[in-house]
Amino acid sequence: MLVDGKLVCVTGAGGYIASWIVKLLLERGYTVRGTVRNPTDPKNNHLRELQGAKERLTLHSADLLDYEALCATIDGCDGVFHTASPMTDDPETMLEPAVNGAKFVIDAAAKAKVKRVVFTSSIGAVYMNPNRDTQAIVDENCWSDLDFCKNTKNWYCYGKMLAEQSAWETAKAKGVDLVVLNPVLVLGPPLQSAINASLVHILKYLTGSAKTYANLTQVYVDVRDVALGHVLVYEAPSASGRYILAETALHRGEVVEILAKFFPEYPLPTKCSDEKNPRAKPYKFTTQKIKDLGLEFKPIKQSLYESVKSLQEKGHLPLPQDSNQNEVIIES
């Protein structure tokens, strides 16, 4: 679908997910205004190198708490992708920009009379509930338990939930068409040069800094599928509410087994840090809602392989001396 000339804003455009959203939007013919902390910072050069960026991408300095700057950037746009969010577990530095930032962006979108706002939330706003039946299927109707997140000092999930609630409340009050994406842990090759938080636990296994793996199960999704999910819900007139983005659940032991198969030269751990308790089981989830819009998820094995290749290419992970550089056939 090509939509030449349509103008959209992407907040936090230099981020892991946002960079792929910008890339996809440019490929589909959109004109993009991206907000970043500093438009001249070399760390945003990867955006300028994207196909179509020279003609249809401009970068703007707009802090999440600078309402006037947000209004100026969003004015004239047909839609907004609000992906910017602080990645920290420090409540003092995270909560205000996450919550008020969501409010300010939607306020600015309402003022500009945009067609739709697509908001990047998280599975952290969905599944953190100790009272949920372990056999129950997690879907878009589920919400995390705010008190549980606060009492366990899970400030990331706490902040994501407050920010999403703020977004819904503001959108309702202002009459803004809001659609929310709730991705799980995101993997896949980054476009930016800096390593992002979600790839750190992969890197620590490969470098040998982690001698064991945790008795932990997580659900994963590819960053390119997350980006496509954002664009699909923006373009589909019928899209509404929340959308979980998730491909498959893996125990950390399965993650290191997959990595060891693809990259046996690295000192990957072979033991679990918790050998007393039963192996952690994943929660059950459904992604039928986003699949109904046409999204087909990439296998996470492919995401893991391409994540590591990208870490090698960007210099975050040294190439083993005896590395076999032949391409690997990835079975789904």
Swiss-Prot record:
What CDD domains does its record include?
FR_SDR_e
Q: What is its EC number?
A: 1.2.1.44
**Coiled-coil annotation: which residues?**
none
Which residues does the record give as NADP(+) binding sites? 12-18, 37, 43, 63-64, 83-85, 156, 160, 183-186, 198
Pathway assignment reads: Aromatic compound metabolism; phenylpropanoid biosynthesis
Top-level taxon: Eukaryota
What class does this enzyme belong to in the EC scheme?
A: oxidoreductase
What does it catalyze? (E)-cinnamaldehyde + NADP(+) + CoA = (E)-cinnamoyl-CoA + NADPH + H(+)
Q: Name one GO molecular function term.
A: cinnamoyl-CoA reductase activity
Q: What does this protein do?
A: Cinnamoyl-CoA reductase probably involved in the formation of phenolic compounds associated with the hypersensitive response. Seems not to be involved in lignin biosynthesis.
Q: Which protein are we looking at?
A: Cinnamoyl-CoA reductase 2
Ranked from the top, the taxonomy reads: Eukaryota, Viridiplantae, Streptophyta, Embryophyta, Tracheophyta
Gene that encodes it: CCR2
